[in-house]
Amino acid sequence: MEPIHIIGAGLAGSEAAWQIARAGVPVVLHEMRPQVATFAHRTGDCAEMVCSNSFRSDDDRMNAVGQLHWEMRAAGGLIMAMADRHRLPAGGALAVDRDAFSQAVTQALQAEPLVSFQPGEISDLPSEGHWIVATGPLTSEALGRSIRSLTGEGSLAFFDAIAPIVHAESIDMSICWRQSRYDKGETEEERTAYINCPMTREDYEGFIDALLAADKTEFHEGETAGYFDGCLPIEVMAERGRETLRHGPMKPVGLTNAHNPAEKPYAVVQLRRDNALGTLYNIVGFQTKMKYGAQVDVFRRIPGLQDASFARLGGIHRNTFLNSPRLIDDRLRLRARPHLRFAGQVTGVEGYVESAAMGLLAGRMAAAEALGRDLPPPPATTSMGALVSHITGGADAKTFQPMNVNFGLYPPLDAMRGGRKGRKDRYPAYTDRAKADFQQWVAGES
């Protein structure tokens, strides 16, 4: 049997390779790292997480991304299995030790007899064979040119920013305290998963002034892409209004200062554990495009981080994606060249889990085709199916932008109360329907 080739061993490519091999079809995984480096990656491991170590909410009852976690587990997904194995305390979220996680994904794929690795860059889209393009937000310039040449698209892109990581030993715990927002979590470790840095109004105003005045990385001439709203740099949020951050990543709600319970902070900066040892913490929601020297100066203004030592500073990178509603069919194939499938962030989904989910589907669909079968996508009533439906036709091609999974992509339920007050009934009804429909889809595959 001819193998299926995958370009890119990120979360989507790794998941696709796993699904193809589990279906009994040989697969060749092409990865340019570490021979060809990128701005954000540090290793040549599969599924390296560069922006954050969080897969977001793990609540499969009230949250669409939590439901997506459930669906990927139900489908035997490698990414979720390794995330569960290497999870860290994070309240109601699923966060992982990113190095242990990516190493585990790599080892699982290396141990799979039907998966073979072929290192090196693919600079042109192949004209024959069965291929999945899962090159992610940091698609190489050469392959990007090949994709644009084939699709006739201009450079569709937005900018992603990366948050800094702090050495835990440099955090002043006489000022900070450990608590998850609203004390979420079933164990004491979960309920104390975050380190909180309190700010008075004076602290906050001084921080905003320094943030707005800091030197920023300038874009190259001709780079006019915008930002994805879910990953805005903090200085861009501050430019939208001085109180924006206090109602975003720095909101003080659901937290009580353990050192002074009677004093309510005006704003709070949260840090989340980044590795199993608890020696590294990332600053939650603090993506930035400030220059390195400015980052150190500005972030050390945060109470408790005045002596902070940084394991990694923030940065910014360009993220390329296809106009999928115009170019991709619901089997994730390029309409003009059906032997090419696309998966992951390059399709216009946003987020680790969403990218891996598209890899899962692309892998299963490619394997089914290689075995002489046709596999339709899951119903649009599921998180996975809602994403596919959105990127392959539900969204307007003229205004298409990357999208996280959310209940707004689900078909509405009849006779359910709308608005904010109806959520406590509506969201569980969505996820109950999604679970039943997804289980039926998985059962129909076999």
From Swiss-Prot:
EC numbers, comma separated: 2.1.1.74
Keywords in alphabetical order: Cytoplasm, FAD, Flavoprotein, Methyltransferase, NAD, NADP, Transferase, tRNA processing
InterPro entries: FAD/NAD-bd_sf (IPR036188), MnmG-rel (IPR002218), MnmG-rel_CS (IPR020595), MnmG_N (IPR040131), TrmFO (IPR004417)
GO terms of biological process kind: tRNA methylation; tRNA wobble uridine modification
Domain of life of the source: Bacteria
Catalytic activity, reaction form: uridine(54) in tRNA + (6R)-5,10-methylene-5,6,7,8-tetrahydrofolate + NADH + H(+) = 5-methyluridine(54) in tRNA + (6S)-5,6,7,8-tetrahydrofolate + NAD(+); uridine(54) in tRNA + (6R)-5,10-methylene-5,6,7,8-tetrahydrofolate + NADPH + H(+) = 5-methyluridine(54) in tRNA + (6S)-5,6,7,8-tetrahydrofolate + NADP(+)
Cofactor: FAD
Binding site for FAD: 8-13
One of the record's GO molecular function terms: flavin adenine dinucleotide binding
Key word Cytoplasm present: yes
Keyword Protein transport in record: no
Subcellular location: Cytoplasm
PROSITE patterns with a match to the protein in the record: GIDA_2 (PS01281)
One cellular component (GO) term of this entry: cytosol
A Pfam family of this chain: GIDA
NCBIfam families, sorted: gid_trmFO, PRK05335.1
Protein task: Catalyzes the folate-dependent formation of 5-methyl-uridine at position 54 (M-5-U54) in all tRNAs.
Family the UniProt entry places it in: Belongs to the MnmG family. TrmFO subfamily.
Name this polypeptide is given: Methylenetetrahydrofolate--tRNA-(uracil-5-)-methyltransferase TrmFO
